[in-house]
Amino acid sequence: MSTCKLTGKVALVTGASSGIGEAMALALAAEGAVVAIAARRMERLNELADRIRQAGGDAFPIEADVTDEAQATAMVQRVLEDHGRLDILLNIAGIGVAAPFQNTTTSEYRQMFDVNVLGLLYAIHAALPKMKAQGAGHIVIMSSGTGRYIHPSTVYSGSKHATSAMAESLRREVGKDGIRVTSIEPGAVKTEFVSRMRDDVRHSLRRDAAT
């Protein structure tokens, strides 16, 4: 009998091509879950899937842009068609321009809200009916400490405040259906995203995370 905690479970991780999403996928696979890994960078997904399989896990890549509702829906449907269930949905895909409001373009506004807010809504909307039918499921939403604390990054912070609020509201809506909702609000994590931040914003995030 397997001692892995997630044997028999099926998980879908968005934003799995790097950073926190990649780490989450590896951890889930190590605990026995079948892991669907989704992102736009298929080459990286294939590399990650190979690493998981070589370690004895089960993973399959799905190329998807979560800002496209049709692609996000198809991503979830692919998991359901292949495995018949979806137990864990981790919405890790995210993007940010950690800069003051006047230094952020309108194109960047749209991009942050498209990925950080609409992208996760599309995936959740597609997954919820099956989770309700199962009577169980776990939805994980990647927010950020910047959604709670003040930083010179108005638009990014606003998008993450929205994700935190949505997680809290969704938890109240679907708890009766046996579905758990978790919001993760980390400070600065050593990933590609943080490495592209301005130094003052990165240091501010680390300072707040330590207090």
Roles of regions detected by a PLM:
Residues 124, 159:
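Active-site helix of classical SDR
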Residues 31-48:
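Conserved glycine-rich Rossmann-like NAD(P)H-binding loop of the short-chain dehydrogenase/reductase
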Residues 100-101, 108-110:
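Substrate-binding pocket helix/loop in short-chain dehydrogenase/reductase
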Residues 42-43, 63-74, 106:
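The beta1-alpha1 cofactor-binding region of Rossmann-like NAD(H)/NADP(H)-dependent oxidoreductases
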Residues 144:
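Residue(s) in the substrate-gating loop at a strand-loop-helix junction
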Residues 10, 17-18:
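Conserved glycine-rich cofactor-binding loop
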Residues 104, 150-158, 169:
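Active-site loop-to-helix junction immediately N-terminal to the catalytic Tyr of the SDR YXXXK motif
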